[in-house]
A protein has these predicted regions:
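DPxDG-like acidic metal-binding loop motif
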Residues: 1-7
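Residue-level detection of beta-strand-connecting loop/turn positions
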Residues: 9-11
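An extended, acidic
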Residues: 15-139
Length: 139
C-alpha cells in the first residue's frame, strides 16, 4: 500500500463511514442475467435497510465509494473487467476503503476475477457475511 491518499481535482477524497443499517447508505449492485454470480438474493437482503441502485457502471460506482457517495458496490463479473477493478482497488483503498473478491479474498487482476466487494471498512464484514450466505454461481 502506498498510503498517499486518493484525490479528485487536487482535493483529497475519502470513503464514507455509513453502515448498512440506514437508508442514508447508498449501495450499487451490478446485476445481469448472464453474470457468473447471481446477486439478486443479496440485493434483496441489503435492500431491506439500505437504498440499493444499479447504475450500470462499476467504475462510476467504485469512484462513488471512494468519494463517499456510495457505501458499498458489488460486482458479479469475472472476465474483461479485471483491469477496471484493479484501478478501483487502488483508488478505493487509498481513500480508506476495502476491495476483495466476493468471497473476501485478495485476488490477482491479470486474470479473470471472482467479482468484487468494494466498500468502506464499517460495512465490509456485514457485506461479506451477507454475500457468503446468499451467493449463487450461475452455470
Amino acid at each position: 500500500a502506498v498510503n498517499n491518499g486518493a484525490y479528485q481535482n487536487d482535493k483529497r477524497i475519502f470513503v464514507n463511514n455509513y453502515t448498512l443499517e440506514n437508508k442514508e447508505s447508498l449501495v450499487n449492485i451490478d446485476m445481469w442475467p448472464a453474470a457468473k454470480y447471481n446477486l439478486y438474493p443479496i440485493e434483496e437482503e441489503i435492500g431491506k435497510k439500505s437504498y440499493t441502485v444499479t447504475i450500470g457502471s462499476i467504475i462510476r460506482a467504485g469512484i462513488g465509494v471512494a468519494k463517499g457517495d456510495f457505501t458499498l458496490a458489488l460486482f458479479p463479473g469475472t472476465k474483461d473487467k479485471n483491469c477496471d477493478i484493479a484501478a478501483i482497488k487502488i483508488i478505493v483503498e487509498e481513500a480508506g476503503g476495502i476491495v476483495t473478491d466476493l468471497y473476501g479474498n485478495e485476488q490477482r487482476y491479470d486474470q479473470p476475477i471472482k467479482g468484487a466487494i468494494i466498500c468502506n471498512k464499517n460495512v465490509y464484514n456485514k457485506a461479506l457475511t451477507i454475500v457468503k450466505e446468499r451467493i449463487k454461481e450461475n452455470d
